[in-house]
């Protein structure tokens, strides 16, 4: 996936739905995609029929549609985050073990995950912060990070304390090594490649302002 020829800018920071719509727009036609728990699930609401994207959910379904509302809600039809969803024509259901075979076997073009930290080299930390009430095991995110051809991350750029989640080196336990290719935040989209971290788009801030927040060299498409 190539970078844009020039830096794109927007005057306002993005909300959660706007960010999800941006991620949906960037998913290539015909892709097989897994949407992780949390913010990434919103992406399903913005995919178009013309994109012909097939959504996979870890609990055993291909052909997942947008989030269910009103009379669409079926308590037995949920995604991995236990959110009621819809099914599209041709949807299929299968055992959890078969679902993980899809994840581990390289059959997913993209997975979209949340994160606590992403490093300058694309390492992903999204399962444990060391907090006493944190979940005790890594879960399926490890399989997705390893098995998907591309890993997109959706996250806020800063923690509640104002620290950057995009870091030179992750300090939390890793979910995957060198797996993240794009990071979508409310302030910017970052591309992670061999040359470093490139700012593709900014929202409500400048590249110089980003450089004051993120503790690493940031490139732009122009250099």
Q: Where do the language-model regions lie?
A:
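Conserved phosphate- and dinucleotide-binding cores of soluble alpha/beta proteins
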Residues: 2-18, 69-223
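Short hydrophobic/aromatic-enriched beta-strand-loop microsegments
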Residues: 51-60, 220
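Short gly/pro/ser/thr-enriched loop/turn and capping motifs at secondary-structure boundaries
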Residues: 60-65, 160-161
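Glycine-rich phosphate/diphosphate-binding loop of Rossmann-like nucleotide-binding domains
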Residues: 52-54, 66-70
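Short, ordered loop/turn segments at secondary-structure junctions
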Residues: 38-40, 59-61, 116-117
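N-terminal glycine-/serine-/threonine-rich phosphate-binding loop
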Residues: 1-32, 41, 45-54
């Amino acid at each position: 996936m190539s970078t844009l020829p020039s830096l794109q800018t927007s005057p306002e920071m993005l909300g959660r739905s706007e960010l999800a719509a941006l991620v949906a727009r960037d998913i290539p036609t015909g892709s097989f995609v897994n949407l992780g728990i949390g913010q990434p699930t919103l992406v399903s609401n913005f995919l178009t029929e013309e994109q012909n994207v097939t959504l996979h959910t870890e609990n055993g379904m291909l052909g997942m549609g947008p989030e269910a509302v009103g009379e669409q809600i079926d308590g037995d039809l949920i995604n991995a985050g236990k959110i009621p969803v819809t099914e599209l024509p041709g949807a299929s259901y299968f055992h959890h073990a078969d679902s993980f075979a899809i994840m581990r076997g390289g059959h997913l073009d993209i997975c979209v995950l949340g994160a606590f930290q992403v490093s300058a080299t694309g390492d992903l930390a999204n399962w444990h912060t060391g907090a006493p009430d944190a979940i005790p095991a890594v879960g399926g995110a490890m399989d997705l990070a390893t098995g998907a051809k591309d890993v997109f991350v959706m996250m806020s750029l800063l923690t509640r304390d104002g620290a950057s989640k995009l870091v030179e080196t992750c300090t939390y336990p890793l979910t995957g090594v060198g797996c993240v290719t794009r990071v979508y935040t409310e302030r910017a989209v970052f591309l992670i490649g061999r040359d470093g971290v490139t700012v593709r788009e900014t929202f409500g801030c400048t590249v110089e302002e980003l450089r004051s927040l993120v503790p690493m060299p940031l490139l732009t498409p122009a250099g």
